[in-house]
């Protein structure tokens, strides 16, 4: 066993003595030692209950003859970090989570791992660590929050974000916003729509590293606890057979994950995270692969913010396995891929079926014939940009307008809420990329303000930053190269004409090439922000959004 190097033999008597100081018996020490990575904390609704999930995981490990050893992971709540300096740390925390998990598992050589995340950057951080370490591993998430209810309608966190813009526009009273605030998030779990956390939990299941049901079983359902126990049991089989993450997360498995991403209409953050996770497995996922798979995979679900449904309804409709069963008819699912269940994808899908065709539509009634995400290119984004096309209104799929340029999110929010943005404008927010932000803040506050003020039918937003999974509308992010690297977005001037053509996958700055070259020669980097601490190191090490914003090798 891998753990033998820290517990077996005469010379390891001091090591065993330290285990005994914590109450472990000789029998427990002799068993396979399974690390249980617990991201529980009291600042994220999706993590507030993870201690309970972890206790169930540990029960499963003991049932199967192993010894669980729990250790923590940090976690940032993107919703609470939104719209202020804290958001600079969100994406940056992904690397901290991956690195600190690696450090713990290399310092203490466990035989296997059960990783228990639930929210935005914690899931990809742990996935990166698992593939980097490549010891037997399984994921079980905390599950999604239920949607709230107000006046007989489903509401969620994005309803509250958009409510702020509605109040500013005089379309809602502060009393109505308070009522919404009080009921939109009714309890524990990852926020209830197809936002980044739930997107990544669903991707984990599709990738084969989480059991069927991992992406959708609600946090408060007993089935979630049973799933956690099953994950604890399954890790022991994976350890005994030495089945490792890279045996499961192959190129075929990543293609499966991308196909599910497209069918569901997942968060654009998957375009950052999936390539970063694949990188740890030694697999390069080019952005063009997203468009290739999108062209073959229809969008079957309109989950909040793109539509009225929430993850609890997706679960009741058959979950991720049912979605995979439908799109497998198109040949976009590699059914021979192995999963942590011990079965192949195809074997898992044998019993899957759709129970509600309004939540998971059949192929002949797909919302659109392409997937939920599109990669755009053009003279404004030579290395690519991303849009959640499933959340864009039909009238905004092809759009031209006047550039309104802001060098930070804060400046843009002030202008939007101050009534300075009008129909036909294209809001450009730059110097918010991985290096320039640094940290690539999510632009949920400005996009929610645009939607809440009723401008989402006539105003687009472009940025080298990124978006929350809760963003809807003509919101195009990850523009690469970013402004801080002298990318074309840095050369846009107030009043320039910009053309967006999502069906043609183009993003064009309509400025004469000679003029652009002149501007490029005149461009100077922004003054230093005098960064200190982790953000300073992050800005030095991070690469482009087009490569997943990973660190330089």
UniProtKB/Swiss-Prot annotation:
GO terms for cellular component: cytosol. The modification N6-carboxylysine is found at residue 121. Coiled coil: none annotated. It catalyses: (2R)-2,3-dihydroxy-3-methylbutanoate = 3-methyl-2-oxobutanoate + H2O; (2R,3R)-2,3-dihydroxy-3-methylpentanoate = (S)-3-methyl-2-oxopentanoate + H2O. One of its GO terms (biological process) is isoleucine biosynthetic process. The active site is at residue 468. The keyword Metal-binding applies. It is an enzyme of class 4 (lyase). It comes from the Bacteria. InterPro entries: Dihydro-acid_dehy_C, DihydroxyA_deHydtase, DiOHA_6PGluconate_deHydtase_CS, ILV_EDD_C, ILV_EDD_N, IlvD/EDD_N. One of its GO terms (molecular function) is 2 iron, 2 sulfur cluster binding. Keywords: 2Fe-2S, Amino-acid biosynthesis, Branched-chain amino acid biosynthesis, Iron, Iron-sulfur, Lyase, Magnesium, Metal-binding. Its cofactor is [2Fe-2S] cluster; Mg(2+). Binds 1 [2Fe-2S] cluster per subunit. This cluster acts as a Lewis acid cofactor. Mg(2+) binds at residues 78, 120-121, 442. [2Fe-2S] cluster binds at residues 119, 191. Homodimer. HAMAP family: IlvD (MF_00012). This is Dihydroxy-acid dehydratase. It comes from Syntrophus aciditrophicus (strain SB). The lineage of its organism: Bacteria, Pseudomonadati, Thermodesulfobacteriota, Syntrophia, Syntrophales.
């Amino acid at each position: 066993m891998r753990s033998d190097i820290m517990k077996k033999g005469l010379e390891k008597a001091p090591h065993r003595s330290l285990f005994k100081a914590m109450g472990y018996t000789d029998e427990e020490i002799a068993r396979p030692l399974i690390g249980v990575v617990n991201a529980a904390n009291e600042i994220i609704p999706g993590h507030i209950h993870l201690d309970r999930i972890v206790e169930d995981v540990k029960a499963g490990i003991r049932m199967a003859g192993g010894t669980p050893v729990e250790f923590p992971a940090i976690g940032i709540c993107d919703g609470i970090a939104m719209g202020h300096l804290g958001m600079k740390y969100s994406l940056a925390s992904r690397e901290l989570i991956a690195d600190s998990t690696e450090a713990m598992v290399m310092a203490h050589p466990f035989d296997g791992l059960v990783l228990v995340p639930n929210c935005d950057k914690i899931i990809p951080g742990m996935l990166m660590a698992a593939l980097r370490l490549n010891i037997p591993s399984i994921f079980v998430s905390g599950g999604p929050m239920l949607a709230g209810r107000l006046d007989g309608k489903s509401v969620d966190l994005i309803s509250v974000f958009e409510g702020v813009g509605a109040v500013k526009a005089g379309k809602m009273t502060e009393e109505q916003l308070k009522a919404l605030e009080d009921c939109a998030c009714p309890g524990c779990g990852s926020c209830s729509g197809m936002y980044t956390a739930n997107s990544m939990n669903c991707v984990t299941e599709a990738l084969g590293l989480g059991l069927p049901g991992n992406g959708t079983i609600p946090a408060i359902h007993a089935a979630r606890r049973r799933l956690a126990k099953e994950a604890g049991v399954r890790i022991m089989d994976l350890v005994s057979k030495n089945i490792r993450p890279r045996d499961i997360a192959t190129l075929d498995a990543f293609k499966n994950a991308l196909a599910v991403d497209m069918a569901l209409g997942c968060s654009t953050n998957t375009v950052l995270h999936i390539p970063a996770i694949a990188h740890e497995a030694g697999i390069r996922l080019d952005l063009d692969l997203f468009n290739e798979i999108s062209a073959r995979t229809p969008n079957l679900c309109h989950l909040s913010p793109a539509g009225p449904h929430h993850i609890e309804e997706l679960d009741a409709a058959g979950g991720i396995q049912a979605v995979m069963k439908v799109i497998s008819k198109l040949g976009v699912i590699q059914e021979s891929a192995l999963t942590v269940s011990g079965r192949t994808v195809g074997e898992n899908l044998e019993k899957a079926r759709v129970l509600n065709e309004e939540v998971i539509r059949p192929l002949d009634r797909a919302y659109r014939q392409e997937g939920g995400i599109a990669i755009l290119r053009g003279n404004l984004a030579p290395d690519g940009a991303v849009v959640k096309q499933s959340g864009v209104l039909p009238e905004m799929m092809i759009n031209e307008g006047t550039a309104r340029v802001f060098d930070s999110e804060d400046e843009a929010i002030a202008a939007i809420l101050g009534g300075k943005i009008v129909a036909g404008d294209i809001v450009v927010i730059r110097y918010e990329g991985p290096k320039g932000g640094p940290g690539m803040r999510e632009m949920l506050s400005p996009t929610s303000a645009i939607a809440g003020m009723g401008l989402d039918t006539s105003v687009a937003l472009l940025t080298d930053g990124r978006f929350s999974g809760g963003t809807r509308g003509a919101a195009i992010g990850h523009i690469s190269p970013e402004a801080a690297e002298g990318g074309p977005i840095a050369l846009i001037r107030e009043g320039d004409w910009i053309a967006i053509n999502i069906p043609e996958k183009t993003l064009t700055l309509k400025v004469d090439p000679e003029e652009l070259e002149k501007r490029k020669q005149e461009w100077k980097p922004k003054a230093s922000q005098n960064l200190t601490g982790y953000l300073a190191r992050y800005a030095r090490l991070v690469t482009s959004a087009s490569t997943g914003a990973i660190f330089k090798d």
